[in-house]
């Protein structure tokens, strides 16, 4: 994320994304949500240095489909696309199965929301 292009994120989203970006001097560009607070995936088909999307979005709780995320990932094959699934257990569809298909897709999760394990650090990995 250290190139001249900016990473893209929705303008209404998890509040720490911009904080962490500033902390590490990563430039960001916020993409406005539509009037109904949904993400227009076409807005993420522009030059960028990466994308981060909470799905379902925090705080709107609106999710985009696996197919829409796959379109974003395909269109940005030379850039990392991070999908934050902190709230996926409350609604939405996981895109974890897509990580086998796309090297540029990173899915992050937390156990603090749906499992009430805030503060516990757990690492899950594939044994292969």
Short names for language-model regions:
Residues 1-6, 24:
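Phosphate-binding glycine-rich loop
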Residues 2, 72-77, 99-102:
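Short, conserved loop/helix-junction motifs that constitute active-site signature segments
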Residues 7, 81, 105-107:
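Hydrophobic/aromatic residues located in beta-strands of well-ordered beta-sheets
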Residues 11, 30-35, 109:
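Short beta->alpha connector loops at strand-helix junctions that form conserved
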Residues 12, 85-87, 110-111:
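Short strand-turn motif at the edge of the Rossmann-like AdoMet-binding core
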Residues 16-23, 124:
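Hydrophobic alpha-helical segments in the ANL/AMP-binding
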Residues 34-85, 89:
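Active-site phosphate-binding strand-loop segment of PLP-dependent enzymes
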Residues 91, 101-128:
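Active-site PLP attachment segment
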């Amino acid at each position: 994320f250290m190139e001249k292009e900016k990473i893209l994120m929705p303008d209404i989203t998890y509040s720490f994304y911009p904080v962490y970006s500033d902390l590490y001097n990563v430039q960001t560009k916020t993409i406005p949500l539509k009037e109904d607070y949904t993400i227009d995936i076409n807005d993420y088909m522009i030059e960028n240095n990466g994308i981060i999307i909470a799905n379902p979005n925090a705080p709107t709780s609106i999710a985009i489909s696996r197919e829409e995320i796959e379109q974003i990932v395909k269109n940005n094959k030379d850039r990392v696309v991070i999908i934050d699934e902190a709230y996926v257990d409350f609604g939405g569809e996981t895109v974890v199965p897509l990580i086998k298909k796309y090297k540029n897709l990173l899915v992050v999760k937390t156990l603090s929301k749906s499992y009430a394990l805030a503060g516990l650090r757990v690492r899950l990995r594939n044994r292969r």
